[in-house]
């Protein structure tokens, strides 16, 4: 659906626009895979070209400019697949000018003390969710945590996700200040007229309004943008 892609888009925006340090903890993808995606997003060179190495002179020029721009940002990527909240907290406390923490994704995280909550994943995920909430308050920075959904929406006519679809949700809905879902109609309906259109559904917003924003999705660059936005170059 594009949850890692939109997380990287947010990561880039915070690092470039606000010149803040961003900590990205990836439990699913490797550092190398994420860097390739960042390069594709920043350079507008198709990711397939990067992975196959089939690059022309124009591509190399774009990559050079993108690499220079990325080198001016402070994006820290940690791809430890077994990291705990306590370890994330400790790493973040050592970072200066921290502006955002991103975690991809919640259900892959392990409890600090394995076996403490038994084999009940709902309880484990709820404990992790609560610990992340406390960490965000202590660090005084926003923490964006990606999450899997259950497959309950697949049995509905309208497959747009709802809060009740949060997998192993427990306290996720309660702890989060904001909950946003991504929905792309073509994922379920290949013949839809909304090709490469994504809906960002703000299902919960403790400090503002809820609603839906439509975005343009460019899968070849792993990029989301405003519908009216056009890349020059």
Predicted regions located by residue number:
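C-terminal regions of RecA-like/P-loop NTPase motor modules
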Residues: 85-101, 110, 115-117, 130-140, ...
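Flexible beta-alpha connector loops of hexameric P-loop NTPases
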Residues: 47-57, 75-81, 110-126, 153-164
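Hydrophobic alpha-helical membrane-association signature
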Residues: 7, 124-131
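Conserved lysine of the Walker
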Residues: 3-4
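Walker B catalytic acidic pair
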Residues: 105
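Cytosolic-facing regulatory segments adjacent to core modules
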Residues: 7-9, 13-97, 111, 212-216
